[in-house]
Amino acid sequence: MASGQEKRSELDARAKQGETVVPGGTGGKSLEAQEHLAEGRSKGGHTRKEQLGTEGYQEIGTKGGETRREQMGKEGYEQMGRMGGLATKDKSGAERAEEEGIDIDQSKFRTKS
């Protein structure tokens, strides 16, 4: 069994190759950088929630979803939701849709201009 240090070294090597190894650490070029990014993003969300209160924070999330639906159009938003619903921990929604023969029109994901 790998020790904690060996595991961290392996994760650090994967992070340096561009893989996200820490949830919320997207963009970090090392394991430590990804950990710091994830922590900062989490704290930012908690701080905003404290400022707005739970109801206000939920309202902002709802408005964001509505805005995105308006930008993409109803069909594109539904297609994106369908693909998100197919996603699993191991496979993206696109991979699962392809495997299961489900037709998802990704051209509708574009923002309307």
Swiss-Prot record:
Signal peptide: none annotated. It holds the Pfam family LEA_5. Induction: Up-regulated by abscisic acid. It comes from the Eukaryota. Residues 1-113 are annotated as: Disordered. Expressed in embryogenic cells, somatic embryos and seeds at the later stages of development. Not detected in leaves. GO terms for biological process: response to abscisic acid. One of its GO terms (cellular component) is cytosol. Residues 1-17, 32-52, 65-77 have a biased composition (Basic and acidic residues). Belongs to the small hydrophilic plant seed protein family. This is Carrot ABA-induced in somatic embryos 3. It comes from Daucus carota (Wild carrot). The gene is CAISE3.
